[in-house]
């Protein structure tokens, strides 16, 4: 009997994943990871409640639950990288980092080496398919819940040891199963936002770790419109929190961030979500991962997702070097944010991805500083 360690988060997806693997004949055990040390603002931290729910789930399913603390690894490999990216003017994706560095690295190693597992499993909405002795990562059946965007860094050795039992189910079906099993998580809300921030105000949380300096907000013509509260608090395409809503150049459209200059501490804005300064067809991607391990040597046509739950866009990929790609979209897209992930697909198959480092607006944004 093959042994599977299921990452039990205290949510409905992982609890149903564990039950499904039991039905498939695996020897199932649970593991709860603590990735963030509780601070003095306990009302914002759900880890104690999640652990309690994890115990309840495992008791109901009659499986053992292991606990492990990866807070140090998370701090060094996820949170510090997250902070450095924000300080550099990027908008990072900590979920991608967490999957790469914690769930499918430290958790996988711990399960295989310390707990003697054959596989690990999680409640991600993705599927795997074995094609010509290579494992392909595929989108989950539920298009609204597909999480392949967050798993593009996985390699063949990792995928060979991973099971994703709910990838062929819809969220509705998962909740229905949980209710039939009387699991405590059946009606539990999905977690949203950045896990270590929880319900806290993003700006106040980040200011505890990053030195913040207010600066000018200017429009694309160089006119000063107001003051920003610190460049790291803003991302390309952001509308809220600018506090310049009453200022207009005549078209009455809301203001959006179209560029950030870290060196001069200046935020540049323009009006309208489809402003040419916010729209792009071309961008550069680095830190490349190919799921099948093949290095791209010639241009290909595929589709790309530039943020979670956004529709894929047809594109051409041109390799500039082993770790740098030029992406040309079939049609312009608004608010491409450097620091976010660009994930590539051929139909339902996730083939890889990387980190957006630069975008090229439809019209050049002139320097006035």
UniProtKB/Swiss-Prot annotation:
CDD domains in the record: MnmA_TRMU-like (cd01998)
Subcellular location(s) per record: Cytoplasm
Protein name: tRNA-specific 2-thiouridylase MnmA
Organism: Blochmanniella floridana
Alphabetized Gene3D superfamilies for the sequence: Adenine nucleotide alpha hydrolases-like domains, HUPs, Translation factors
Job of this protein: Catalyzes the 2-thiolation of uridine at the wobble position (U34) of tRNA(Lys), tRNA(Glu) and tRNA(Gln), leading to the formation of s(2)U34, the first step of tRNA-mnm(5)s(2)U34 synthesis. Sulfur is provided by IscS, via a sulfur-relay system. Binds ATP and its substrate tRNAs.
Keywords assigned: ATP-binding, Cytoplasm, Disulfide bond, Nucleotide-binding, RNA-binding, Transferase, tRNA processing, tRNA-binding
Assembly notes: Interacts with TusE.
């Amino acid at each position: 009997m093959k042994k599977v360690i299921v990452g039990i988060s205290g949510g409905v997806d992982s609890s149903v994943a564990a039950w499904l693997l039991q039905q498939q004949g695996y020897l199932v055990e649970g593991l709860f990871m603590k990735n963030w040390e509780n601070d003095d603002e306990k009302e914002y931290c759900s880890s104690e409640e999640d652990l309690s729910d994890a115990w309840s789930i495992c008791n109901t399913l009659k499986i053992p639950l292991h606990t492990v603390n990866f807070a140090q690894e998370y701090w060094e490999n996820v949170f510090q990288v997250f902070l450095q990216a924000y300080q550099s003017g990027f908008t990072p994706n900590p979920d991608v980092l967490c999957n790469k560095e914690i769930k499918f690295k430290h958790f996988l190693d711990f399960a295989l080496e310390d707990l003697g597992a054959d596989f690990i499993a999680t409640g991600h909405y993705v599927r795997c398919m074995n094609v010509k002795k290579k494992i392909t990562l595929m989108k989950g059946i539920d298009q609204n819940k597909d999480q392949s965007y967050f798993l593009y860094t996985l390699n063949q050795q990792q995928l060979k040891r991973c099971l994703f039992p709910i990838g062929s189910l819809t969220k509705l079906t998962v909740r229905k199963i949980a209710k039939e099993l009387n699991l405590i998580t059946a009606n539990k809300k999905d977690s949203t936002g950045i896990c270590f921030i929880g319900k806290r105000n993003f700006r106040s949380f980040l200011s505890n770790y990053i030195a913040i300096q207010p600066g000018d907000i200017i429009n694309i013509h160089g006119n000063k419109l107001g003051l920003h509260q610190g460049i790291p608090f803003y991302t390309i395409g952001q509308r809220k929190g600018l506090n310049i809503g009453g200022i207009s150049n005549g078209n009455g459209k809301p203001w959006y961030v179209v560029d950030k200059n870290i060196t001069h501490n200046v935020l540049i804005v323009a009006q309208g979500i489809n402003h040419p300064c916010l729209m792009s067809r071309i961008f550069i991607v680095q830190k490349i991962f190919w799921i099948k391990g093949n290095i791209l040597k010639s241009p290909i046509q595929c589709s790309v997702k530039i943020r979670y739950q956004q529709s894929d866009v047809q594109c051409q990929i041109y390799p500039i070097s082993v770790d740098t790609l030029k992406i040309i979209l079939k049609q312009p897209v608004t608010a491409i944010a450097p620091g976010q992930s660009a994930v590539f697909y051929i139909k339902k198959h996730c083939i890889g991805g990387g980190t957006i480092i630069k975008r090229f607006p439809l019209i050049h944004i002139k320097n006035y500083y």
